[in-house]
């Protein structure tokens, strides 16, 4: 038990704290606010408090809990909404109304709810960390696998029969090699700053299909990959994150609203229960865990929310699921680090951020990956991390963006100019990149189309050529261009408007499956080949621009039937043949 000697914003200094350890959770003051020790000097402890510290004064008690900041992992995580330190917001609302009272806690997993447990092991079986004890149908989409905690191994001496149990009831007893008995419940705790162990990492060879054409075709992310979405205000970071949370083919989505506006989390809460998962037809909320740590919540908890989210994601990965984690936005987390570092009077680095910013960001993104899990029957699971970065004024040379780019393999650069032109998703195809293309192209070739990479590279080359031509057009006007280059501008406009642009609010266009993406690309590239042939055969470019099929190509993104889109290839060819006849080419 210690006493407060100093309070500065979210930081509290207490003395008489001998015997405490780093990152231990403490209760601060008469109100019992939750805090975490982040520095120890002699018997003094520096504590970052995860709640508003107004009204606390020197002399009040500080009590250690003996455990580090941990999350509860078990049935009940899905469909829940937590704050940054895994307090269930719905439960807190029942306890204190719309405004959360300070010092309030509630168990993260519901203690009174009974779950239907079906054992998969029997007495006498040998188990190690990561083995599955049994399964619980948590939602209609996800079957929750009850895992042996990583530190336990031994022989099952008792296992619960199939039936309904709460998370607090003992469902198994394991005799460890030293003869002691470990009681296992449906949940276990895990410290958030420690990454969960696995057997080994696998190369990222399977793409995370998002249903967004720009991303899947040009700048793919692999399952277990890392991506950053930097962009200025209003360029569509949050809507892009929402689209990925809705439609990506991950089985579980963890969405962290870290220091962003509260209304954006409200949007997710309003929309997700109504939206249907394209694969199962069930509400999307049934595969989602939300962590809300909005801009009006205490700054210190932003740091915790990032770690809480990634630990929950790793837990579902250990069950053999593909998990997508959205962090919106990591800039606010970095700003929280900057504020706490300033209060600790540490030497500032670039733009006032702490010198350890780069290693903190790397540590977070390194917890992504596709892995073989622990256990006697290894499974494959993955955590893909997609972090939004909001640099002030859209300046990509800012430290958070630069340090993030060193670590992540995919960069989706959002562009304010594109957003102003109402071109969404506003991902700038000239500045963005993906380093996963070589490793995932085999999957595309095997499962979708053997010419995927060739078509993607052709389209990319056309878009780059367009950027060069646009500069010439700005100086001398479009009429000075030769016919071939005028024709390229017609095709690239189709690529931009009919392929890259996508309507997140249209029922059909919000999600574009891989087969449809490839068919659409084939239609446009076929038009390009025929256009070049027509120009070489002397057909005027103006005539090509007037072809009626162009309007149909413009509407194909709203057409759910792939065969109807494929039919546009024949229609294009017929209309070009008529042009050739007309001009005797």
UniProtKB/Swiss-Prot annotation:
The keyword Transport applies. Its main location: membrane. Pfam families: ATP-synt_ab, ATP-synt_ab_N, ATP-synt_ab_Xtn, ATP-synt_VA_C. Its EC number is 7.1.2.2. GO terms for cellular component: plasma membrane; proton-transporting two-sector ATPase complex, catalytic domain. Transmembrane segments: none annotated. It comes from the Archaea. It is found in: Cell membrane. One of its GO terms (biological process) is proton motive force-driven plasma membrane ATP synthesis. PROSITE patterns: ATPASE_ALPHA_BETA. The keyword Transferase does not apply. ATP binds at residues 231-238. It is a peripheral membrane protein. It catalyses: ATP + H2O + 4 H(+)(in) = ADP + phosphate + 5 H(+)(out). Component of the A-type ATP synthase that produces ATP from ADP in the presence of a proton gradient across the membrane. The A chain is the catalytic subunit. Belongs to the ATPase alpha/beta chains family. PANTHER family: H(+)-TRANSPORTING TWO-SECTOR ATPASE (PTHR43607:SF1), V-TYPE PROTON ATPASE CATALYTIC SUBUNIT A (PTHR43607). NCBIfam families: ATP_syn_A_arch, PRK04192.1. This is A-type ATP synthase subunit A. It comes from Desulfurococcus sp. (strain SY).
